[in-house]
Amino acid sequence: MSDIEIIEEIQPVSLKRKQPSTSFNGKRKRTSSGLIEKSETMKGTETEFEKFVIDRTITPQRKLNAEDVEKSGEDIGSSEWRKRLECTLLGSVSTPVTVKKENNIRKKISCFNCDGEHNLRDCTQRKDFRRISRKKRESGDGRQRVFYNDVGISKQREKHFKPGVISDRLRAALGLRGNDIPEHIYRMRRLGLIDGYPPGWLRKSIKSTDQLKFFDSTSKEDDEMSVKPPELDTSKIVWYPGFNGEQSSLNDREDFKIPPRDVFCSVYQDELLKIFKKSEKAEKRRAKSTPKHKKFANEDDDDVIVITSDEIKIDKFNTPGEEDSIIILDGSASTEEKHLLTPIRKDVKLGESMFELIGTPVFGSSLLTPVAPLEAFAVGIQPFEAREELTGCKGNFRNLMDKLKEIRENNFVPEPEEEVILVSTNEISSSNNSGTAKNKNNQNRKRNRRHAK
């Protein structure tokens, strides 16, 4: 069968009396556990896992009557959400509620300076900047207050909620009496004293032991700062009645033995130390798995071959220019070092030189390339000469501006310019035509006079 068990209706039977086992077709039916039969609130089965519990409770559905809903709505304040819920559940029995949509009335524009119905830039009165800044601050605070009250939970509301404490209104909604233990406390017990406690509140109850690591000249890479083990702050532990908090008037159906507070704190402190030690061991294993490759001085290598004195041969080479001269290639090492093909490494401390050259330095025998003298860089550069400025040439622009200011203050009126008469091209052409006509008439008169004589 699957993990879902066959659920039967649990009848109110005394705890001492057991129900007879029923059989069907020779097979025994699986009933719910005795723990759930004793429970008055739970009517189902649960599948328990290592870190969590799946609740498979089946709640019977009840038909809602309009009269019962109306009676229950008289005590509790009606809301739009409640009216919509009644319409969907009751259907045609209840009269549909028409929700009036509030018209989004735009806020009137008000001037921060004079409280008029116009923008600040259109205000004609003298601007009072203190009043403007105060009005802007008030309007901004009002907008923020409306926004934060509508969305989320404010800090004032958070103060009303305390972990481990259930309000009377929530108890009434869960069907619990004043001394009943809520169902989540029983599930916390099944997970255990350590795993059942909320891990988020456990992290907050640990004292912070963060430290800064400082490096100086004497510090090394292998130096590790000693990390202190975590400590538990008992003042920040949340006490749940029925789980880790004692209360004599509780109705406990499991008869659970609640440990004292001191024992509870010591158990958690031991658990934190175990976790801390496990993490340290894991870090050490991780460090060992990635070793640093180091070679120390005077360490025997596998590629070193020891040669006896009989096998040593001196290499001789003849130069092409000097046939008689012989050059012997022989190192200046000691007799012990001659037997080794590779030189022996020596211990070198921090700050010491790697090698030494013995001999007197010769002046001018440097291998570095010569650098040009400093005088060569000054070729073509003229020296700077500080000269005094002429005092007579100063303030020309200032004098010009002062004169213009005097002219404006004295209301200087410029002289009227000569009137210029603008004549169009048509008028000029007509005047020219009239002039030519007059000249022709005069010429004709002169001719007539000559003929008359």
From Swiss-Prot:
UniProt record, GO biological process: RNA processing
Extent of Polar residues compositional bias: 425-437
SMART domains cross-referenced by the UniProt entry: PSP (SM00581)
Region Disordered: start-end pairs: 15-42, 425-453
GO MF terms held by the record: RNA binding
Compositionally biased spans, kind Basic residues: 443-453
Domain of life: Eukaryota
Pfam family membership, one: PSP
A single Gene Ontology CC term: catalytic step 2 spliceosome
Name of this protein: Uncharacterized protein ZK632.11
